[in-house]
C-alpha cells in the first residue's frame, strides 16, 4: 500500500483505496494545532491502517477530536462508530444526511453496494444552514451546503499558508434517486465551488488538484452531466 503524505500546509492524506482499505474514499487529516480533524473516515475496515498512517506522520489518533462527514455514504462514514467508541471523536454533518448516518434509513448509506454492514452513530454537530463557520484548534473551517450527490452533502474549506484548501468530496457523483440525488442542485453546488477559487482541491476519489486544474476538473463533470 501507499504511504500517508502531506498535501500542503496542515493537510495530509491518511486513507484511501491504496492507503487503508480498497473500499475507502480518501481520508484527509487536518492539523489544527491543539487538535486534529478528519475529513471522512472510510468504510471502517481500514481504521487500523489509518491510525498507523496518522502515527507515521508524527501525530496520535487520539488527537482526532472531530470528524467531518461530508455525506452519508458508507465509504466516507463507515468508521464513525469505531472512532467515536475508541477516541470519543465528535461527528459533524449536515442535518439533511442525518437519517443515513443515524440509521433511520440505511438505503441512504449505499452500504448494500459495498456488501458491508453499517453501524449507526449519532451526529454531535448538525449543520443546518447554507454556510457556517466553526473553529477547531487554531483553524476556522468554512462549511458549505453543496447538495446534489446527496441532499446533505457538504464541502469544507480552510485557508492555510499554502492558500485555500477545499475538501469537495465526490464532486464527480455518481447519482441515484435512492439517495435523493439532484442534478440541478448539484450543478448549482459546483458553481459555488468554482467561485471559491481554491488553490488546492482534495476530492473524495479522484485525489488532489491544484490551481487552474481545479476549475477544469469541475467543469469536465458539468459538461458530462449536461441536461
Question: Model features per residue range: what roles?
Answer:
Residues 13-19, 67-70, 143-146, 177-181:
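Short, flexible loop segments at the rims of nucleotide/cofactor-binding pockets, characterized by
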Residues 45-48, 55-132:
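Active-site HxH/HxHxD metal-binding segment of metal-dependent hydrolases
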Residues 2-57, 155-171:
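Conserved beta-strand hairpin/beta-sheet module of binuclear metal-dependent hydrolase folds
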Residues 7-16, 112-115, 137-141:
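Short Pro/Gly-enriched beta-strand edge/turn motifs at strand-loop
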Residues 37-39, 68, 91, 165-167, ...:
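Residue-level marker for buried hydrophobic side chains located in beta-strands
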Residues 20-23, 126, 147-150:
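A short catalytic or substrate-binding loop motif that flags glycine-/basic-rich loops and adjacent residues
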Residues 19, 95-99, 171-173:
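Short, acidic/turn-prone active-site loops that include or flank metal/cofactor-
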Residues 43-45, 107, 133, 140-225:
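Metallo-beta-lactamase
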Amino acid at each position: 500500500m501507499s504511504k500517508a503524505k502531506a498535501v500542503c500546509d496542515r493537510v495530509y492524506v491518511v486513507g484511501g483505496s491504496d492507503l487503508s482499505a480498497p473500499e475507502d474514499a480518501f481520508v484527509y487529516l487536518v492539523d489544527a494545532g491543539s487538535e486534529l480533524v478528519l475529513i471522512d473516515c472510510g468504510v471502517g475496515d481500514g481504521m487500523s491502517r489509518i491510525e498507523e498512517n496518522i502515527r507515521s506522520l508524527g501525530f496520535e489518533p487520539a488527537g482526532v477530536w472531530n470528524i467531518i462527514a461530508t455525506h452519508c455514504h458508507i465509504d466516507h462514514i463507515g468508521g464513525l462508530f469505531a472512532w467515536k467508541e475508541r477516541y470519543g471523536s465528535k461527528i459533524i454533518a449536515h442535518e439533511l444526511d442525518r437519517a443515513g448516518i443515524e440509521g433511520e434509513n440505511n438505503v441512504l448509506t449505499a452500504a448494500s453496494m459495498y456488501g458491508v454492514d453499517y453501524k449507526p452513530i449519532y451526529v454531535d454537530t448538525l449543520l443546518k444552514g447554507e454556510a457556517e463557520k466553526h473553529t477547531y484548534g487554531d483553524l476556522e473551517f468554512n462549511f458549505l451546503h453543496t447538495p446534489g450527490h446527496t441532499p446533505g452533502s457538504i464541502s469544507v474549506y480552510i485557508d492555510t499558508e499554502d492558500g485555500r484548501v477545499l475538501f469537495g468530496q465526490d464532486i464527480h457523483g455518481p447519482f441515484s434517486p435512492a439517495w435523493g440525488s439532484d442534478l440541478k442542485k448539484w450543478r448549482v453546488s459546483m458553481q459555488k465551488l468554482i467561485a471559491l477559487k481554491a488553490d488546492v482541491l482534495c476530492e473524495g476519489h479522484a485525489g488532489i488538484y491544484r490551481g487552474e486544474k481545479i476549475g477544469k476538473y469541475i467543469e469536465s463533470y458539468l459538461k458530462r452531466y449536461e441536461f
